[in-house]
Amino acid sequence: ETVRTVVDGENVEAGGFARIKTVIDEKKEENPDTLVVDGGDFSMGTLFQTVYEEEASELRMLGYLGYDATTFGNHEFDYRSKGLAQMLDTAAASGDVVPSLLVCNVDWSEMNDERQLLKDAFDHYGVKDYEVIEKGGVKIALLGVFGKDSLSCAPTCALEFKDPIEAVKETVATIKEKEDVDMIVCLSHSGTSEDPKKSEDELLAKAVPELDVIISGHTHTTLEEPIIQGNTAIVSAGEYGINVGSMHLSQNAEGRWEVEDYNLIPIRPDIEADEAAQEKIDAFEANIDDTYLKQ
């Protein structure tokens, strides 16, 4: 769905998966090897959450839009362990293309019934610490991490998590040891803050300098320019799908990646909605009408 929001003091209609599909397709037409990722919190905030468990509409739409990967945000746990597990099982069984789900800091060392339910669903879906994707001859390691503040905002989450920085360090070390990659990108549902002590993704970049890019979620921060910490670029396109971030990187003489171009594309009514994507959205919406709104 689109949202009503205030931008520069003006009420505007923004966002919407059908418009985002148009933008992604245009970017992929320019460069078929475009990597498309998300920083988590993909599943709550509209009426579509009412069919979260039965339809897994958000993950299925992300797959249709062309997203390669995402991670978990705190709102993925809003329907508790049973709801999240059922949603993952539904998405996995749908037969649709769905994005990879990545998170490296779940602690499975102590199990109970709820955690086992989630572990089984994670395995069914194929949730991983990291994966390697090749785009245009560039091998990219993608990993996901769930931040400390995210956990504090997820009171219904039954999982335990390792320290985000330590888990990312361990995962990057594993990637360096086992994989031959050119770039490492972290999908972090941790966020940034004006308070340096609370800016989790800036602290992560300082602690793990091997990261080339951090896709920063959770704090709804709109970064008009990347935060550059050492050799790591931290980027965030804001909230509610009202922008799509676009970034082009180039490799320097030392083999590190530098931001050559970065911009936020506002998702507004002047962008034509993709018809096929809108038809899929309408079908999910019709199910919501029949199941909940017409009773």
Label each region the model flagged.
Residues 251-295:
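A short C-terminal boundary segment appended to hydrolase-like catalytic domains
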